[in-house]
Amino acid sequence: MKRLLCALVLASSLPALHAANGDERVLAAKDAVQRGDRAKLAKQLEAVRGHELEPYVEYWLLRLRLEEAGAAELREFLGRQAGSYLAEKLRGEWLKVLGKRREWDAFDAEYPPLVQADQEITCYALQNRLRLADLGALDEARPLWFTPADLPESCIPLMEQLLADKRLGTDDIWERLRRLLEAKKPGAAKATAAYLPVGQAPSAKTLDAIADKPLRHLALQPSNFASSRQGREMALFAVQRLARTDPAQAAQQWEGIRDKFSAADGGYIYAQLGWQAALRHLPEALAWYAKAGNAPLSDEQVAWKVRAALRAQNWAVVGEAIGQMPKAMQAQPDWIYWLGRAHEALGRQEEARALYQRIAGQPNFYGNLADDELGRPIQLPPMAKPASEEVKAVAALPGIRRALALFRIDMRIEGIREWNWTLRGMDDAKLLAAAELAHRHEIFDRAINTADRTLALHDYSMRYLAPFRELKAMQPDALIMAD
């Protein structure tokens, strides 16, 4: 009898022992890939056959060999792992190699199945289209010039073609330079300055000096600084940079030189001053925004203009500023609500009510506020709980199994990516089942994040988890007060 019991205990523990052993080998494979040890990685791949994370070890080995791996070998993996996060990741990395090598036929074959192309791959795709005389590729590439960020190497030939074709001019170069300096991207700013005509480009030393001590630059600039575009732009950069630390002093410096600049330049500076003042809740914010006139505002600048107007209870400016927002931004519940409040304050009751009705009933803060404005009770929707069969079905998905295995061995970043990828396209019922599964495995951040994605069916107990509530309740009152 004792032997039978021992045998049963041993048999029941074998799967756990096998999983633990497999987990250790996966971690050993991870160490091997970090060291670039192909031989050890290949050995670990054989050792993890049948483990949930076998595809990860295989992917790591292929990634190390990507430059020399054959197309047939890569496509075989992509075929077996079709639709998975790893297939998407490997395909993206392979496309970058193909684009860099100018192997366009293979690139053409692999690009369409890619779900999420990053900017580097997108630019390779545009290069390929341009190679085939598709001039629309340059039209699509042009907006990238104005993004205040470093551009991947694959985008540079497109930008240089736009410059060569005069589709980007000197004003556009200065515009990108301004945006990069504003975004504190000195490396990209210096690279952009190199495209300016001879004699106009500021030196790297000048840009660094202004970024470090803007007030010193303004104090020491020559009296005829405004006679050149470079002189004016460097003064604008200095005022903009000073405004980030001391808007009042920046405004004082600006007032002393503003007559040397165009109205457009003045609008740019006043928009900067208004934005920085609004961030600090300074009373001058709205006045500076007003002086900016019709100057273009970034999404963040216009949002802070609304907030400054709300603080001042200036409902006319609230409505005006929301009207300056891009359409997608105007459609967000918070700005719909505040536009409704602005209409109501200005006596336009019907317009206000129509806006409240657009968001009333939505399961969010501003939907609740709209309900309140309409005199409707705020009610929680019926709680939706997944059936056990739904949880089992989600638990059986390969991507979910891989994600849970990654969390189990503390590869959280990879686990989150695998989890999020697998959630794509899930309806509310499946999302709630996935949230319940994450909760059972005590992966609380994924439980909350997943439950928060639902559109019609909701479980607020999952969105606002309190996994240690029982432990807290067990503490003596005196100890709770001491906390």
Language model segments and positions:
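Bacterial N-terminal signal peptides
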Residues: 6-13
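Cell-wall glycan-active module
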Residues: 1, 14-483
